[in-house]
Amino acid sequence: MRNLIGKNKMHRGLMPIGDGEQLGINFQTNGSYYSSLSTSYSTNWFGNKRPNSFSVSLFYSKQSDISSYYRNNALYNSLNYGYGYGYGMLNNSYYNYESLLDDDKNIRMFGASIGWGKRLRWPDDYFQFMASVGYTRYMLRDWSYFYIANGNCNNLNLGLTLSRTSTDNQLFPRRGSEFMVSLAVTPPWSLFDGKDYAHLALDPNSATYEGELQDMYRWIEYHKWKFKSRTYTALTNSQKCFVLMTRVEMGLLGSFNKDKKSPFETFYVGGDGMSGYSYGYAEETIGMRGYDNGSISTSSAYTESTGRRTSNNAYGYDRFTLELRYPFMLGNTTIYGLTFVEGGNAWADIKKFNPFNLKKSAGVGVRIFLPMVGLMGIDWAYGFDKVYTSGGWTKGGGQFHFILGQEF
């Protein structure tokens, strides 16, 4: 973006023109079911003199649901004739999935954020501090996948992140570590709005039930804590060597009022961990290889008694990984294989958080980095423990997982 505004001008006010600035516009759609548009700007030299980062972003997305008529007929067919959801004549279905989307049932999201970061000199030069302010508006219309199906919900939050990175290579680290601790917090609206949340929205059959839900979640409140770490240890001194990677992750989503737990920003645990649209769109996706997507967090919501149920996802999770890697090709194109053991779990009630109660898995995989494509990979993992799925309680068993993009 150097000299984008005027000829031979290196800076325009406080904002530098050039020096690694990034301007991005992204649009995604799969037709009438889902679409999103986002734009962002970032620079690492805000203020001209010091390496301070600055970023601003905007996004909008819309996701539609299928009609109740189609859902009921597909269920009837699957029970009586073995038919299921399908596209056209696939799976012997008489219904075209895309043509029976109900645009009157949807969730729309609009959001904006602004962030500032600074490299620290203490305890050492590898530390960085980030602060951000974000706002998201959830606009729901007959959206049956959330605790609240209709209305507008607002999320205004402050994010604080302290991180340290000392790895020797971004694509295939041999030595060093990555640590990150973060807090996202909203104003404690329930402490000063004067509402009695203990007696709101208790009777789903009440004529005022949806209005009471809107009052309860017009402004979302929570405090969200996360810790992530990775370490890399080369087992020999050669360039192509075995590298041992260890990972520890934990996350907790707390509330200021036990009767106003947030139905958003929960943890969706299990599977490949790839982000993207889903029925529980306003959630954080956490991978756990060897299990179906979301099956670990769903199991916790199904088995734990948490009083007022506000989400089918988890409010706490942990994840531990031991991974052995070996590079087949290094450079602009990087290819390496890996084998791993992994353990983790999720809890709907954070009072029951137990880092030693783990769902375990093991497997092998490969990663390929291509300059024009980015990082891709495939893993095969076997889950040793039972989780709750649509078929009841079953072992994770053998699972293939596809990976796109770099994960922290």
Task: Give each language-model segment a name.
Residues 1, 141-328, 339-340, 347-349, ...:
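C-terminal outer-membrane beta-barrel translocator/porin domains of Gram-negative envelope proteins
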Residues 1-172, 177-179, 297-301, 375, ...:
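Gram-negative/organellar outer-membrane beta-barrel architecture
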Residues 1-2, 58, 248, 336-347, ...:
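Active/binding-pocket-proximal capping segment
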Residues 20-22, 34-36, 51-55, 176-178, ...:
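Active-site lining segments that contact anionic ligands and/or coordinate catalytic metals
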Residues 72-75, 263-265, 354:
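Short secondary-structure boundary/capping segments
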Residues 120-127, 236-242, 330-332, 374:
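Secondary-structure transition into beta-strands, especially the periplasmic turns and strand N-termini
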Residues 340-344, 367-373, 379-383, 407:
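Short, loop-centered acidic/histidine patches that primarily coordinate divalent metals
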Residues 349, 353-373:
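Strand-loop-strand
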